[in-house]
Amino acid sequence: KQVNPDMTFWSSPWSPPSWMKVNHYYSVRSNSKVNKLPAEAEITLYEGTDDVDKKFYPKQVAVNDYFIQDPRYLQTYADFFCKFVSAYQEEGVVISRVMFQNEPWAYSIYPACAWTPEGIIRFNVEYLAPTIKKQHPGVQVYLGTLNTNRIELVDKVLSDPRMKDAVEGVGFQWWGGQVLPEIRKKYPNYKYMQTENECGSGTFDWKAAEHTFNLINHYLGNGCEEYTFWNAILCDEGTSGWGWKQNALIRVDSKTGAATYTPEYYAVKHFSNKVVSGTKVLQYKEKGEDNLPVIVFLTPENKYLV
């Protein structure tokens, strides 16, 4: 707060409390190396259906909500969001925005929760949005973080006429970015944001930087007002607690404490050093045969950036 007193935060849970879920466990999928969920518990996810299409993520869609669709549970969970916001406020940390679920279509071995479009609508419209508006009227509710390229799923949620009064914006990440242009064209009245950078595999190289550079162009060029990073600083090989090597903007040697600014850091600086709050996107071109995306900004000082 001393460096940036205007800084605010947004938040989205990976998993509801286990007792609120149909499988009573933090993950959706079983994996003997990282969790203790019995393999037979996965039957709830698809219930024997086999409609698989590898062109999409997820390649198979859950048929059940993993959050118990009981009004008592749904309201209690909405209250939990408010308690979370209040607790951070007491510590001087401003939570300005919440989203109902991190990656509702990631049926993972990590903390996760599968949701159907019907469940997403029900929780956001009937419970989360009205509860937040009542207890924390200054906090925004966004629909996120959407991680599927199955456009029919996103469209089914946003086409419910009640959604426009429940959420102010939509957050996309990973595969969700593929449907951003079409969704924004169909639903132009929402605000849009990118909610998680693709964190790579611990390479910390220029290829990762170029990938992030193109992602920033894509999301900002298609109307997103914010771009969020998953990792700012990691040590050594960038290995997470789950064993996944990832990239970051800054890499620290845990033995010496030496910090290295990675190529990805400079890719980000290319934008953040000039594209300040209030800057507008005038034109955007996706990369084509020339492999070069082009984006034109107008800053609050009426300067053009290309």
Model-based region annotation:
Residues 1-155, 160:
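Substrate-binding cleft and catalytic face of glycoside hydrolase catalytic domains
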Residues 130, 134, 138-141, 162-206:
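Glycoside hydrolase catalytic-domain groove-lining segments
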Residues 158-170, 218-226:
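Structural recognition of alpha->loop->beta junctions
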Residues 104-106, 110, 143, 147-154, ...:
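Active-site clefts of carbohydrate-active enzymes
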Residues 8-12, 96-100, 140-143, 168-172, ...:
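Structural recognition of the beta-strand scaffold that forms the well-ordered cores
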Residues 194-270, 280-287:
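Aromatic/acidic polysaccharide-binding cleft in carbohydrate-active enzymes
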Residues 72, 76-83, 123, 127, ...:
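Extracytoplasmic/secreted proteins, especially bacterial periplasmic and envelope-associated proteins
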Residues 273, 284-306:
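Carbohydrate-binding surface patches
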